């Protein structure tokens, strides 16, 4: 570059070394400013109210709603065993052994932590007879795995046979409390390496549950009114709702809004992620392939805890009142009682971002179309018999609760309820400032990368993403700062 500058007639022939150094310094500074101007401020510190109970729950008597919250909080962190002790029933297949190992950032009930607890399971006694899948890393996201399609007997992918069920990472093989189910031959892990090679594998990360009770208590009619208001938007966005198959009501939890309620969300997770049968999912769950072939789980791996089925149920003779509940009810009450995250300041490169910058970023976020899906406040809750903080309360979730086509770039080719292979629920953005892993599969920790991923063939968000790309670097940074303030 120096020789080019010295010989370039635009610089008057030979340029002296001092002038050349100045030019190079200026170029470096310009590049540094350009890089700085579009940088994710990163995960923000502090709690921002996450992990706390709703005000009316905290203010209740120790024997009232506060007791249910505290009981659920404790059970959410219980470590499950296969057999023996009060908290048995784990497995025979599982992804983790406690709710809080997946829902931990920045507090119990949140999203996946910075250090992945799954990575230690083969060495710390949780899953000693297992092989650690290559995609599980120490500082990567906590995940569940699905194969979008079934495999043929010859090992090829059958594109005409949709699968999409969870393939649990670990088995109880090798554990001292696994009883008769203690052979890798009897209970092998899924073929993760083959699925990776065939590109027939997708990942999901945990969704945070802060403020979930408010989302649950949004009336269907409120959501439908919001949808109607957006029918004539200028951004090519046309979302829909996933519905509960039994009563046709709007479902709203999970990456594809596949779960109607927090109770169903809890029951499914207990069964799928930890292998614990309950009043909603009453049997130990085989892998999708075992279910398809009709083989089911080996008899030697059934009822390992000795409780019979379901393994989790109510205890009418329990005392105090909260202890009467089954774990699934305790989990759902805990999540229903969690306060939503509060917006906060943003620190970037050691400097406090101004409130004006954050406000400007919020206005830009709306003007370019982001708020069409990420609705700042989709409505007020209806009356609640659970606790007064859930009644007539605003829900600043930054979501319309609708499912949208996100294109082939984000598609996971898994259908759940009315949500197709490239459809996902608009992820609520409250608490984004403290979220580490982004998008449904945790593929990135960088907001810029996540925003760019919204544009691909078939995505409803492509126009909005293009609007973002057309902003100046300063304006893009203002939006990033705003997002990390949530």
Listing of model-derived features with the role each one plays in the protein:
Residues 2-3:
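Basic polycationic patches enriched in arginine
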Residues 6, 13-24:
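Bacterial N-terminal signal peptides that target proteins for export
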Residues 11-12, 483:
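Short hotspots in intrinsically disordered terminal tails
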Residues 12-13, 409:
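Residue-identity detector for glycine
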Residues 23-33:
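Bacterial N-terminal signal peptides
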Residues 35-486:
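Periplasmic c-type cytochrome electron-transfer domains
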């Amino acid at each position: 570059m120096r020789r080019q500058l010295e010989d370039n007639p635009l610089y008057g022939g030979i340029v002296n070394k001092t002038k050349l150094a100045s030019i190079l310094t200026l170029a470096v500074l310009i590049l540094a400013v350009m890089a700085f101007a579009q940088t994710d401020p990163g995960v923000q510190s502090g709690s921002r109210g996450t992990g706390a109970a709703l005000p009316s729950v905290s203010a209740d008597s120790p024997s009232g709603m506060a007791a249910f919250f505290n009981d659920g909080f404790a059970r959410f962190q219980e470590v499950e065993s296969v057999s023996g002790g009060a908290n048995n029933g784990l497995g025979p297949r599982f992804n983790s052994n406690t709710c809080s190992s997946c829902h931990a950032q920045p507090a119990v009930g949140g999203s996946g932590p910075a250090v992945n607890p799954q990575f230690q399971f083969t060495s710390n006694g949780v899953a000693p007879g297992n092989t650690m899948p290559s995609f599980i890393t120490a500082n990567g996201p906590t995940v569940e795995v699905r194969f979008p399609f079934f495999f043929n007997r010859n090992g090829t992918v059958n594109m005409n046979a949709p699968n999409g069920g969870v393939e649990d990472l670990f088995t109880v093989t090798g554990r001292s409390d696994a009883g008769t189910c203690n052979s890798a031959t009897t209970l092998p892990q899924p073929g993760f390496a083959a699925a990776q090679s065939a590109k027939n594998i997708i990942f999901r990360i945990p969704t945070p549950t802060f403020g979930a009770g408010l989302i649950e208590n949004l009336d269907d009619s409120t959501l439908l009114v919001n949808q109607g208001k957006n029918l004539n938007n200028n951004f090519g966005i046309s979302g829909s709702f996933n519905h509960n198959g039994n009563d046709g009501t709007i479902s709203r939890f999970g990456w594809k809004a596949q779960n109607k309620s927090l109770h169903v969300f809890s029951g499914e997770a207990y069964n799928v992620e930890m292998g614990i049968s309950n009043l909603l999912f009453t049997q130990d769950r085989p892998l999708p392939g075992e279910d398809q072939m009709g083989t089911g789980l080996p008899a030697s791996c059934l009822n390992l805890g000795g409780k019979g089925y379901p393994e989790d149920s109510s205890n009418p003779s329990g005392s105090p009142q909260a202890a009467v509940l089954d774990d699934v009810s305790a989990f759902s009450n805990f999540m229903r009682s969690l306060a939503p995250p509060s917006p906060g300041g943003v620190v970037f490169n050691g400097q406090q971002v101004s409130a004006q910058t954050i406000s400007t970023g919020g206005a830009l976020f709306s003007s370019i179309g982001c708020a069409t899906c990420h609705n700042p406040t989709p409505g007020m809750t209806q009356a609640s018999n659970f606790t007064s903080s859930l009644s007539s309360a605003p829900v600043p979730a930054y979501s319309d609760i609708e499912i949208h086509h996100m294109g082939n770039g984000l598609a996971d080719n898994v259908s759940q309820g009315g949500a197709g292979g490239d459809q996902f629920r608009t992820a609520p953005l409250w608490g984004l400032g403290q979220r580490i892993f982004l998008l449904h599969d945790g593929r990135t920790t960088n907001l810029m990368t996540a925003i760019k991923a919204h544009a691909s063939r078939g995505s409803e968000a492509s126009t909005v993403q293009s609007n973002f790309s057309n902003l100046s670097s300063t304006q893009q940074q203002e939006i990033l700062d705003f997002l990390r303030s949530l």
